[in-house]
């Protein structure tokens, strides 16, 4: 249900 967008953002941080 959660889009893997926030996950990519974390990795980007």
Curated annotation (Swiss-Prot):
Source lineage: Eukaryota, Viridiplantae, Streptophyta, Embryophyta, Tracheophyta
Protein EC: 3.2.1.117
Organism, scientific name: Prunus serotina (Black cherry)
PTM entry text: Glycosylated.
Keywords tagged on the record: Glycoprotein, Glycosidase, Hydrolase
Catalysed reaction, written as an equation: (R)-amygdalin + H2O = (R)-prunasin + D-glucose
Enzyme class per UniProt: hydrolase
Record's subunit section: Monomer.
UniProt-recorded name of the protein: Amygdalin beta-glucosidase II'
